[in-house]
Design a protein with these regions (language model features):
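Amphipathic alpha-helical interface elements
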Residues: 11-25, 68-70, 74-79, 88-341, ...
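Residues immediately within or flanking Cys/His clusters that coordinate Zn2+
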Residues: 25-28, 61
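Short cysteine-rich clusters marking metal-coordination/redox-active sites
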Residues: 31-34, 64
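Cys/His-rich microdomains that often coordinate metals
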Residues: 35-38, 71
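Short cysteine/histidine-rich zinc-coordinating motifs and their immediately flanking basic loops
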Residues: 42-48, 76-83
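Short linker/helix segments within small regulatory modules
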Residues: 46-61
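A glycine-biased, small/acidic residue-tolerant capping/turn segment at secondary-structure junctions
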Residues: 356-366
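Short secondary-structure subsegments characteristic of cysteine-rich extracellular domains
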Residues: 365-379
Length: 399
């Protein structure tokens, strides 16, 4: 049994030595069995430890939701050790206590945010010698990010669909993450650096902690571990870098994430089956994220400032004109090719089975991607994702 790991059967006798850490051992937020992230839960502990029956109600415990393993955080193990020592001194073989939550106010700022000080104290990696409470996780509805995406002062930058930064100018950034339950997580100390008006806005979307912080956000911020991105996350990151480059050059946000698009980007995964329903879902979702999210009004204004006339141009043609004028060193038609293919893919999949035009357009999509004309979704999808990524990357470098 590993250090701090709980017995699978409650009531099985344990040796007190099991609660003392081995030299160099540090309890981390990863399961020993599956390496998945652990959540903080408050469990009832009932074990016989070296002859003393110890019962603790609400003991902070780390739980793996994947394989149901449980581990004790360091302070919980020390609590068991302390209770055993007290019982031994009093010649008692039974200890029964109810733990009360710490409910500590760490004193960051004047806005009363909802957070759980137990998260800071019991989630591995958050406690620091200085700035006590700085890394306390504060949880929000994910709609909280939409204001910053539409704000003229702030902007969002994504390293992946679940890890990003809120930026202001070139000298301020605040990291955020999305946990496995779709909640936005930020650090209490970072929030306190915001103007008070912004803190009150955040407070309006502030929710109770669900004690689940394992994510790319945690891995990067606490463990300095950056896992390889999926092709979907890598494409979304490339889009974000392009939008950031546009903002720095033109001072305008040429695309936005409304609630629907943001939800789609967070939950979207690569297709695993080739069905009519999956085809339409993939094509519609990619269109909404990578085409429809462009702000035609802003693109038109930039085109006009660069000497072009956007009046007679539709949305996709307006994007092409923007590229022609802002990136003259690039072949705009080549850069735009994946975007036209994406548009045609949705049209093709929406007409399949109803007329021949859908099948013809689908073959044309495959030909332009450089794959077999009769290719299905499982061949088209990875090729299109790669082409879109190439275009965003080239655009960012050209800007």
């Amino acid at each position: 049994m590993g250090i701090g790991k709980l017995s699978s059967a409650q009531g099985v006798s344990m040796d007190l030595k099991e609660f003392f850490p081995e030299s160099g051992h540090i309890q981390r937020l990863y399961c020993d069995r599956c390496n998945g992230h652990l959540d903080l839960v408050f469990d009832d502990f009932f074990e016989t430890v070296s002859g003393v029956e110890i019962s603790i109600s609400g003991l902070p415990t780390l739980h793996c939701p994947k394989c149901n393993e449980k581990y004790l955080p360091d302070d919980s193990r020390f609590a068991v050790i302390h209770l055993h020592e007290q019982a031994t001194k009093m010649s008692s073989d039974i200890v029964k206590v109810t733990r009360h939550k710490t409910n500590q106010n760490f004193g960051f700022g004047t806005v009363p945010f909802i957070y759980d000080s137990d998260d800071y104290k019991y989630i591995p990696g958050l406690k620091r010698a200085g700035d006590q409470g700085f890394l306390t996780p504060v949880f929000f509805n994910r709609e909280v990010l939409l204001k910053y995406d539409s704000s003229p002062t702030y902007r969002l930058s994504f390293a992946s669909t679940t890890y990003g930064e809120i930026r202001r100018g070139d000298d301020f950034s605040m990291p955020f993450g999305l946990n496995g339950n779709g909640k936005v997580v930020m650090w209490l100390g970072d929030i306190a650096r915001l103007p008070e008006t912004e803190q009150y806005y955040l407070r309006s979307e502030n929710i109770e902690s669900d004690h689940s912080i394992g994510s790319e956000f945690y891995d990067g911020q606490i463990e300095s571990v950056f896992t390889a991105l999926s092709k979907e996350d890598d494409l979304f990151k490339a889009r974000s870098e392009f939008l950031e480059a546009c903002f720095k050059k033109f001072g305008s946000k040429v695309a936005h994430l409304d609630k629907e698009v943001f939800d789609l980007s967070v939950t979207f995964n690569a297709p695993i089956v080739d069905t009519d329903k999956e085809r339409r879902h993939v094509a519609d979702t990619l269109n909404k994220i990578y085409l429809e999210s462009f702000d035609n009004k802003v693109l038109g204004a930039v085109v006009k400032n660069l000497g072009g006339d956007p009046k007679s141009l539709g949305s996709i043609k307006r994007l092409q004109k923007f590229i022609e004028l802002s990136c003259p060193t690039l072949d705009a038609s080549t850069i735009m090719n994946p975007f036209y293919i994406l548009y045609d893919l949705r049209v093709a999949y929406s007409h399949l089975g109803s007329d021949e035009s859908g099948e013809e357009k689908l073959q044309y999509v495959s030909v332009r991607l450089g794959i077999k004309p009769d290719s299905g979704l499982m061949e088209i999808y990875p090729s299109l994702i790669e082409k879109l990524h190439e275009s965003f990357t080239k655009l960012t470098k050209a800007l």
